From Swiss-Prot:
InterPro entries: Crinkler_N, Kinase-like_dom_sf. This is Crinkler effector protein 8. A motif (Host nuclear localization signal) lies at residues 590-599. It is an enzyme of class 2 (transferase). It comes from Phytophthora infestans. The active site is at 470 (proton acceptor). GO terms for cellular component: extracellular region; host cell nucleus.
Length: 599
């Protein structure tokens, strides 16, 4: 068995080895070369020549002839070696061809391969899919392997782990300093005339990328297509199933909410952008990157974003500092008016793509709800943003009814409840605040807080003759930044009493039975039953009922007879007493345990 290094004449690319038994024929060698290079024509159409340097020596890889050969150029020596009379014949044995030559070694060229006429410069296949597969296999696998914030500037400028193959004509044309330059070219691309990434080239480096039709006096809207032609195209090309949205708060009346550009993997916004027209200072979108973000990414070191003002663009790592504040760390600046800077941004974005999966995999579930659209069965669309919640109604009637309810809540000063901050009658949209997280209490002390918050709201609500009617944990939401809860979704709220069938659409297993009694009516007492239901469906019902008086209180709350249930005022007073007693018992227990340890 012998290893022969082969080079294709007239085609840019690296040499390749072929292992073959010396007892085989040149025809077998042609077949092996065809299989290695996946050529789509018969093997016998290949022409093979020995790469002799003179005497019994082989062409050295260090010579100028071989260097030019790899670039697709034919030197006088290569032309002389590939004359027709020197072609190896298919029936010739390999051993006879090698007779009199030095034993083949590495750093040599042994066989020159000439392709059939008409195929010398034609690609055999598009290399885009193979490039993408290899590139994605280069992703950073673990969170601990992510570069530090301080190293990100160097990281985004490093050569790609898998270079993008370009045909010789494009490779040479883009080498101009006005387009790319050799240093940046060699970080992004490599010569490949056999299977260049034609689809990638045409998709990412399109005419819109190379020759942008926008100038420095254009509006922000005019720049959207330009920014997208780089950022959206690159990210979307690498991650085909990602969610990409832009300008999603423009139609909203609630001010700061969603970013101007949003890129999410598995529902997690790992990359975002804030954009302004050219005449705006870039400090404005830079500050919006941190102001619009409420950190929900747990312990990951950072996510990413950009600030753009016309052609000026800055890349940032966005992180949470030790005090809990969201900060930005500049990792790169670009003047996209110039072609080399646009290519440099592509390099930075592709390198950042290598980090996205590890970040997404280590985010908590809450990060996936930062931006989410929920479609209710009643036709209401709920749009979640970091700080706000939009509710878009299906009918004018429903929009007005819910708006009137929230207007009443505001007039009464109902505490511990969400509130409408802006309205859009044209879009049938109510924007509510705050935005919290759906999380049940994890301890008895937290349950006291949550129930107390609900009862504080009910005291004021009931005092003004209203009832919520749909209290359950999905409508009791925890604040993002503190251990307190608030009541949401007053769409089913009504004045007390209500006659059957009002409220009949509610679920029987989650609501008091008096709502569903034919011919009957229900009052604010249904909300007290619901407070008991919160205890029953909490994570710590057993701990609650371990105290007999608390267990009796739970029975009273959920008594089938509405008149036997306590009022919200009474329930809040009892809850406060239970909370004090539990705190005293906990304090006494700690004292006893401390004495035992001393003993």
């Amino acid at each position: 068995m012998v290893t022969l290094f082969c080079a294709v004449v007239g085609v840019a690319g690296s040499t390749f080895p072929v292992d073959i038994n010396e007892n085989k024929s040149v025809g077998h060698l042609k077949k092996a070369i065809k299989e290695e290079k996946m050529y789509q024509f018969p093997a016998d159409e290949l022409q093979l020549f020995l790469a002799k340097a003179g005497g019994n020596a082989w062409l050295s890889s260090l010579t100028e002839d071989v260097k030019k050969l790899k670039k697709g150029e034919k030197t006088a020596l290569v032309k002389s070696l590939t004359q027709e009379e020197k072609e190896l014949q298919g029936e010739d044995p390999i051993s006879e061809c090698l007779e009199g030559m030095d034993p083949p070694k590495v750093k040599q060229i042994h066989v020159l391969v000439a392709l059939p006429p008409g195929t010398s410069s034609a690609p055999i296949s598009d290399g885009t899919d193979l490039w993408l597969s290899r590139f994605q296999h280069s992703e950073v696998a673990k969170l601990t392997l992510l570069p530090t914030r301080g190293d990100l500037n160097e990281f985004i400028g490093q050569p790609l782990p898998v270079k993008i193959g370009l045909p010789q004509s494009v490779f040479q044309a883009w080498s101009s300093p006005l387009i790319l330059g050799q240093l940046l070219r060699d970080k992004l691309f490599e010569l490949n005339d056999i299977s260049p990434c034609e689809f990638l080239k045409d998709s990412v480096f399109s005419a819109a990328f190379l020759y942008p039709q926008v100038d420095g006096d254009a509006t922000e809207s005019a720049f959207h297509y330009f920014w997208d032609s780089i950022i959206r195209v690159v990210l979307g090309f690498v991650f085909r199933r990602a969610y990409v949205n832009r300008d999603s708060s423009r139609k909203s009346s609630s001010g700061l909410k969603r970013p101007d550009f949003l890129f999410a993997l598995d529902h997690i916004c790992v990359f975002r952008g804030e954009e302004k027209e050219p005449r705006t200072s870039i400090t404005v979108p830079r500050e919006e990157l941190s102001k619009k973000l409420v950190w929900s990414y747990g312990g990951v070191p950072y996510v990413f974003g950009y600030a753009a003002s016309g052609f000026e663009l800055e890349l940032f790592a966005i992180y949470q500092d030790v005090t809990g504040n969201v900060k930005t760390h500049l990792i790169g600046g670009f003047n996209l008016q110039h072609a080399p800077e646009r290519f440099r941004l592509v390099l930075a974005l592709l390198n950042l793509c290598l980090l996205f999966p590890a970040i997404v995999q280590n985010c908590p579930a809450s990060a996936g709800t930062e931006f989410m659209d929920i479609h209710r069965a009643n036709g209401v669309k709920v749009r979640l943003s970091p700080i706000f919640v939009d509710k878009i109604f299906h009918t004018q009637e429903e929009y007005r009814r819910v708006k009137q309810i929230y207007d009443s809540l505001k007039a009464y000063g109902v505490p511990c409840a969400d509130a409408v901050v802006t309205v859009d009658s044209d879009q049938l949209r109510l924007t509510l605040k705050p935005r919290g997280i759906e999380m049940k209490p994890c301890s008895l002390s937290e349950l006291f807080v949550a129930l107390g918050n609900v009862l504080e709201a009910l005291v004021v609500l009931h005092r003004n003759g209203w009832m919520h009617r749909d209290i359950r944990w999905s409508n009791v939401i925890k604040h993002i930044d503190r251990v307190e809860w608030f009541l949401i979704d007053f769409a089913d709220a009504a004045q007390s009493p209500q006659k059957y069938p009002s409220g009949d659409h509610l679920t029987h297993d989650e609501h008091a039975s008096d709502i569903f009694m034919e011919g009957g009516s229900h009052t604010t007492a249904v909300d007290l039953w619901a407070v008991g239901y919160l205890v029953k469906t909490s994570k710590i019902e057993r701990e609650w009922t371990a105290e007999p008086e608390r267990a009796l209180f739970l029975d009273r709350l959920m008594n089938p007879d509405p008149s036997a249930r306590p009022t919200a005022d009474e329930a809040l007073q009892l809850l406060s007493r239970f909370e004090r007693e539990a705190a005293e018992q906990e304090s006494q227990g700690k004292g006893v345990r401390k004495k035992h340890r001393r003993a």
